[in-house]
Amino acid sequence: MYNASFYPTPPEVAEKMLAKVGKLYERSILEPSAGKGDLADAAVGKLDRYYNRCREVVHCIEIEPELQAAIRGKGYPLVGTDFLTFWPDEKYDLILMNPPFANGDAHLLHAWEILDHGDIVCLLNEQTLLNPCTSNRKLLATIIEEHGEVEHLGSCFAEDALRKTQVRVSMVHLRKKREEPK
């Protein structure tokens, strides 16, 4: 049905992710590798009291056609298909992401690159952080050290998740400050 790297974000994990960023209104939000839009749904749940058309402020990217249809069916703008080649036309200040565990480091580094300013909250395979054996992982470790924090969540896709895995997961929160004019 879906590809092997599709692990929808459990609702309780999505809530933890949103708690890292506080208020969501007046934010431009992107969920790359959105799957069926679980993080977008969680954000809209928080925004619903502020906006009548809150689904329009949460944009999604998804590579799988079946999942794209699910996202469109929920009313979210699909602004791209392959996140690793995506360059936004607008500036996002919040990126919520649960990328494929196999190359989550590349996804998070790309998110950092396209983020104008603001926050990224990302789920990664814990080994991506504990075993910095590649240049991407080393760069990511430096960015986290300078701009963020990590919370190890353990096997949060093992119990009540739609798709289960014993992969241990970490939540990374990065904050990029607005660049000062030169």
Predicted regions and their residues:
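Class I S-adenosyl-L-methionine-dependent methyltransferase catalytic core
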Residues: 1-182
